[in-house]
């Protein structure tokens, strides 16, 4: 026998690859030492078994903020969400369509857009109108003789006016319903969409209804829906893009979780029981992002209404990129930043930006189709002046199109003529300078108010309860974004960043407060988020996130106090001890003890390690910990949290290790047995408060891997609530109520529901007080003065 044959053999067995076989006998026991095995850089990846891959996928989905595969919210909850949206839609319909024909006058900038829409409907292009006030008076009488054949110079893309022309085509051009129908219906649809977005973000019908009502009763939203101008249409298309962005986040993360879980894994160290990561350091490719493509379409159409939508393309694109980086980091991808750039960032760019450009160009098809439109001769005029063309050799229509855009750019960046109602972007969030859209003084208004002096007024001031409370809510959202890395807070901030912050570069330009209607939905979502946090009814953003609470409403009482059982001495301590076993989120209270299988008390050891699954030994009937009821990083079979803080990627990543971290690593040219794949070693937790059993202690001393294994994937739903025993034998066991899954909203408390109702009541009261000034009703002059709280509102 050669010297090589006398060495201990290494085989693939139940102790894992690269370990000495246990059948060597006593003579070779001293030589049996564990070694790391082959070079991990040459260690090929191995896929998981189907049941382990399924458990891994659901664990990843939880940490990525997604429900498990095939799991939906309860039918009752979903129905309540739709009912909440329907109620909000009804309120929005009444407030926007009631007496929509009043006032029968061209209001504010309707002189540009209503007549422009009529010209598109009548001629196919925007013609010039002869005379200003005279043309408006004739238009109100149905006399359109002021419309001439020569084209009018317009400074906005045509899509918004084509949409407004649809209302005139349906209801005629001689009444306010025809002029304003399109903007009114868009306003109602925006309310429904905000309610559905809130339901998707917060998973609470109560908060969805609150968001819908707040959106439906905001004064700026009502005024802009009852006026034939472009900004309401712009806001709706951007909101559609935001909705598609949220769907893309879910869709792309679900794909990533599935491909990681069913892909190949390897151990960086090659050691048995070591954490596992995807074999590909770049992670899997996520091909196909249809919802991001849809977001590009919606944002491109928004740009076809007004150019300010271009900032939404940039802001939402950055949000999608940041979420992709965070998702790969959570999934344990080693080169997560590079993969986020090249495998997610570039494909996302080519899904979003070209779609937006194509949709924007599609909005100009009528302009290309009709040579009578303004700007078609710009290329020829430039050649006559001896100027060069933007694209030499391109058709005149293309060069004229580019020159037309240069002309619009120059107009928007040089408009600085003074206006009585102009304001700055920082004035908008406090509603300092609203715009007077319509005013009929006492000398012209009919005397229908019952007072000596009656007036009719329409002002664009928002609901002060929404906007002023929204300013406080914005602070809460910023705290949640930076402190808790809550993706919902970052999504709301993306809306602010898209439609509000860019105006800071236009301080020298004439701009108006009603532009803020474009980010009104995000003000409402911020207020909803803050109210939900204060009322403690906002669910978790992902499986590892604690409940958000800023102490504005008292925390819920412990479940034990809701039960009709006596509270003898020691019950509170033993209950907290038991809950700490389940959640691993709080220290043992003084005097708390654990219960051994035999019933004798055992002193807790806060420094030793013990498998969390052994809680059933100390508390009979306790199920295995559910991976979605606590921080996944604290459970066996799931990755340990990284000590490196997560990057500021607008998400809530908690770790950087893929699941499952403790699978034995099969050596090359071997197959993993079912027991190898299905029984991962549980990682030792040095922070556990329980002492190891004898087998674990012996295994630790000999250097061998732990002898206990997880029985398989953990069930996400406990079979039965455990019984928690008191050290006092005279105290009967207390059954703790079953714990909710992480995605379920917390139980509603009367104080929380009352708080939400109180804020909603304030919003309704403010809307009732201001509604006459949002709709131009005939009111007394003194009643109008009662609403002018600030001198800048006059």
Question: Model-flagged regions — what are they?
Answer:
Residues 92, 211-216, 223, 299, ...:
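Short helix- or helix-capping micro-motifs
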Residues 97-140, 347-348, 356-431, 778-789:
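Aromatic-rich transmembrane-lumenal/periplasmic boundary elements in polytopic membrane proteins
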Residues 193, 233-282, 298-299, 523-529:
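Specific aromatic-rich, kink-prone transmembrane helix
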Residues 106-107, 179, 183, 220-233, ...:
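Short acidic/glycine- and proline-prone juxtamembrane loop motifs at membrane-interface regions
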Residues 75, 87-88, 177, 194-217, ...:
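Transmembrane-helix signature of polytopic, membrane-embedded enzymes
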């Amino acid at each position: 026998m050669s010297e090589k044959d006398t060495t201990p053999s290494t085989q693939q067995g139940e102790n894992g690859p690269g370990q000495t076989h246990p059948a060597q006998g006593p003579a070779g026991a001293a030589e049996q030492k564990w070694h790391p095995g082959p070079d991990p850089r040459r260690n090929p990846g191995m896929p998981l078994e189907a049941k382990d891959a399924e458990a891994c996928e659901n664990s990843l989905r939880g940490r990525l903020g997604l429900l498990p595969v095939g799991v939906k919210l309860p039918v009752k909850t979903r129905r309540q969400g739709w009912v909440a949206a329907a109620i909000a839609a009804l309120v929005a319909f009444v407030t926007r369509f009631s007496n929509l024909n009043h006032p029968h006058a061209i209001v504010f900038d309707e002189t540009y857009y209503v007549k422009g829409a009529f010209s598109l409907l009548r001629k196919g292009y925007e013609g010039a109108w002869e005379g200003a006030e005279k043309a408006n008076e004739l238009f109100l009488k149905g006399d359109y003789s002021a419309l001439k054949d020569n084209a009018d110079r317009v400074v906005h893309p045509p899509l918004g006016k084509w949409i407004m022309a649809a209302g005139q085509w349906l209801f005629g051009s001689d009444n306010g319903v025809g002029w304003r129908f399109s903007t009114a219906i868009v306003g109602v649809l925006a309310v429904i969409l905000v309610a559905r977005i809130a339901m998707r973000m917060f998973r609470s019908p109560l908060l969805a209804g609150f968001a819908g009502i707040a959106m439906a009763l905001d004064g700026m939203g009502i005024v802009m829906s009852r006026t034939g101008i472009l900004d309401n249409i712009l806001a709706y298309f951007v909101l559609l893009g935001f909705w598609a962005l949220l769907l893309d986040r879910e869709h792309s993360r679900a794909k990533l979780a599935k491909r990681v879980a069913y892909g190949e894994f390897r151990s960086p160290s090659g050691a048995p029981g070591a954490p596992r990561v995807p074999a590909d350091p770049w992670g899997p490719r996520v091909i196909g992002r249809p919802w991001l493509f849809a977001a590009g379409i919606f944002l491109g159409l928004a740009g076809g209404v007004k150019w300010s939508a271009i900032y939404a393309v940039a802001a939402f694109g950055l949000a999608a990129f940041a979420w992709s980086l965070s998702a790969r980091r959570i999934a344990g991808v080693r080169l997560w930043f590079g993969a986020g750039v090249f495998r997610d960032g570039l494909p996302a760019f080519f899904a979003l930006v070209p779609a937006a450009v194509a949709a924007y160009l599609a909005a100009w098809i009528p302009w290309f189709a009709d040579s009578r439109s303004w700007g078609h001769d710009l290329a020829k005029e430039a050649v006559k002046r001896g100027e060069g063309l933007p694209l030499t050799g391109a058709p005149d229509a293309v060069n004229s199109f580019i020159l037309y855009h240069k002309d619009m750019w120059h107009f928007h960046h040089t408009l600085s003529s003074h206006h009585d109602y102009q304001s700055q972007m920082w004035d908008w969030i406090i509603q300092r300078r609203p715009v007077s859209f319509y005013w009929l003084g006492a000398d012209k208004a009919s005397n229908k108010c019952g007072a000596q002096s009656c007036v009719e007024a329409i002002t664009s001031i928002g609901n002060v309860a929404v906007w002023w409370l929204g300013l406080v809510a914005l602070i809460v959202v910023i705290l949640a974004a930076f402190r808790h890395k809550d993706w919902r807070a970052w999504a709301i901030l993306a809306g602010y960043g898209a439609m509000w912050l860019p105006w800071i570069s236009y301080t020298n330009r004439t701009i108006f407060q009603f532009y803020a209607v474009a980010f009104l939905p995000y003000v409402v979502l911020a207020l909803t988020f803050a109210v939900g946090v204060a009322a403690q009814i906002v669910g978790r953003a992902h499986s590892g996130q604690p409940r958000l609470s800023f102490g504005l409403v008292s925390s819920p009482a412990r479940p034990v106090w809701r039960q009709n059982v006596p509270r003898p001495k020691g019950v509170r301590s033993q209950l907290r001890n038991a809950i700490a076993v389940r959640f691993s989120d709080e220290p043992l209270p003084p005097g708390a003890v654990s219960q051994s299988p035999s019933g004798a008390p055992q002193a807790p050891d806060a420094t030793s390690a013990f498998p969390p699954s052994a809680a059933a030994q100390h508390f009979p009937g306790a199920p295995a910990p559910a991976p979605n009821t606590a921080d996944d990083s604290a459970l066996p079979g799931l990755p340990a949290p990284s000590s490196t803080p997560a990057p500021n990627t607008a998400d809530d990543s908690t770790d950087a290790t893929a699941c499952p971290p403790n699978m034995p690593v099969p050596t090359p040219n071997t197959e993993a047995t079912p027991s190898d794949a299905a029984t991962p070693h549980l990682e030792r937790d040095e922070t556990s408060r329980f002492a190891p059993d004898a087998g674990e202690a012996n295994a630790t001393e000999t250097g061998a891997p732990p002898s206990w294994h997880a029985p398989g994937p953990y069930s996400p739903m406990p079979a039965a609530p455990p019984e928690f025993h008191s050290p006092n034998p005279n105290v009967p066991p207390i059954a703790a109520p079953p714990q909710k899954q992480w995605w379920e909203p917390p139980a509603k408390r009367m104080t929380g529901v009352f708080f939400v109702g109180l804020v909603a009541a304030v919003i309704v009261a403010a809307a009732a007080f201001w509604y006459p000034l949002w709709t131009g009703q005939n009111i007394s002059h003194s009643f109008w003065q009662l609403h002018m709280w600030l001198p800048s509102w006059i």
